Amino acid sequence: MKSNDYTIASLKEKVREMNQAELIDFFEEESRSGALKVKQARVKQIAQETQAIHEYEQMLEYERRYNGKVVCGIDEVGRGPLAGPVIACAVILNDGHHYIGLNDSKQLSKHKRASLYDALTQSVTYAIGAASVEEIDKFNIYEATKLAMHRAIDKLPVKPDVLLIDAMNLNTGLIEESIIKGDAKSVSIAAASVIAKVYRDHLMEEIHEEFPYYDFNRNAGYGTKRHLDGLMQYGITAHHRKSFEPIKSMIKTEENAKTITKPS
């Protein structure tokens, strides 16, 4: 049967799994404009799927350098926010992994991140490491980030041979590759980026339930207008980084020196 044997409404489902060659054969006798639009939509989708597969293959470059070794990707989220911990994730991908569309978490929609997070956490070996607000203020954000990464590695149930790290040197004694913009160049680092991002977002949503003044459920602790307005009106919480501006300057004034412990 050809496309002109079907109603236009039923064509979308019919062509959903067709490849390019099958489409050409299926639509060879078609003249209806609506049906041809369905064909073009599927052609475009195939092109996008092909491109995504190509990009995924390119992002396997570093992993393939260490074929036969246990490769771990490491990334962090939360270096820039005014509140909340910095979170690191260490990921060892499963054999035969195929997470098409995986990329730097910042480049993905919230829906896509959530979908990949569910798929990854059900399949890969991973561990989360955190450095607290107190540690960030004590050591600085760079050192706290390294601390979180070390903790993630130490919590892995499998010892890796190779660490692929997003722009960081950890001096673990293992083989390390520090990759600039690694979350867009390595699938292992990208996977760590996604898991860390979704994990931290959930954590900030929980903090928002306790302290709703700062819009943490939307800004993840970053200095948005609503967050800054909340700081000016209510002061700081124990979750705020006192070494970060403008909080550092705010706590020098008597009116903002008190840390709120719960909503009023």
Swiss-Prot record:
Give the signal peptide range.
none
Keywords from the named record = Cytoplasm, Endonuclease, Hydrolase, Manganese, Metal-binding, Nuclease
Q: Which GO terms describe its biological process?
A: DNA replication, removal of RNA primer; mismatch repair
Q: Which residues bind a divalent metal cation?
A: D75, E76, D166
Q: Does the keyword Nuclease apply?
A: yes
EC numbers on record:
3.1.26.4
The catalysed reaction is:
Endonucleolytic cleavage to 5'-phosphomonoester
Q: Which cofactor does it need?
A: Mn(2+); Mg(2+)
Q: Where is the RNase H type-2 domain?
A: 69-263
Q: Mention any one GO cellular component term assigned to this protein in its UniProt record.
A: cytoplasm
Question: Which top EC class applies here?
Answer: hydrolase
Q: Which Pfam families match?
A: RNase_HII
- Its domain of life reads Bacteria
- Function (record text): Endonuclease that specifically degrades the RNA of RNA-DNA hybrids.
The record's family statement is: Belongs to the RNase HII family.
What's this protein's name?
Answer: Ribonuclease HII
Species the sequence originates in: Macrococcus caseolyticus (strain JCSC5402)
Which gene is this protein's source?
A: rnhB
